[in-house]
């Protein structure tokens, strides 16, 4: 249980920091180009707790799937899980693109950032929640 909690906390901290840096700093101008598609900043900040809840849910889900015995464990398994989960997210973004007026550039950049986020999350979780070694080996 200790590894689970530590992996969750580490993944959550990374996801929050990466989201702030990638979306809030690196993609700030790209998001500004599509500002009409988003809530005003003041309103968004009033709902910021929902972002944190969503990021906690993402970290928790990642660790739960990994801890359920995902492909033997270790960093490589964490990376594979991260790639699979981001493929799922990109698939959902394709539907968003078809049904909502999001610029393709924004969705592509969000997806690139998503792959980085999920791969690094996989490395973090895989390193912390690595398989237990047999005694005496």
Model region roles, listed by residue range:
Residues 1-137:
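Juxtamembrane/disordered regions of integral membrane proteins
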């Amino acid at each position: 249980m200790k590894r689970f909690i530590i992996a969750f906390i580490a993944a959550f901290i990374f996801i929050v920091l990466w989201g702030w840096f990638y979306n809030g700093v690196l993609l700030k101008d790209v998001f500004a180009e599509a500002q009409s598609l988003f809530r005003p900043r003041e309103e968004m900040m009033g709902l910021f707790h929902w972002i944190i809840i969503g990021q906690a849910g993402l970290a928790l889900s990642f660790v739960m799937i990994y801890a359920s015995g995902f492909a033997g464990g270790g960093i490589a398994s964490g990376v594979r899980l991260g790639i699979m989960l981001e493929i799922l997210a990109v698939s959902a973004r394709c539907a968003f693109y078809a049904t909502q007026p999001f610029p393709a550039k924004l969705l592509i950049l969000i997806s690139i950032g998503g792959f980085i986020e999920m791969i690094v999350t996989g490395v973090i979780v895989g390193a912390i929640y690595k398989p237990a070694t047999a005694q005496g080996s």
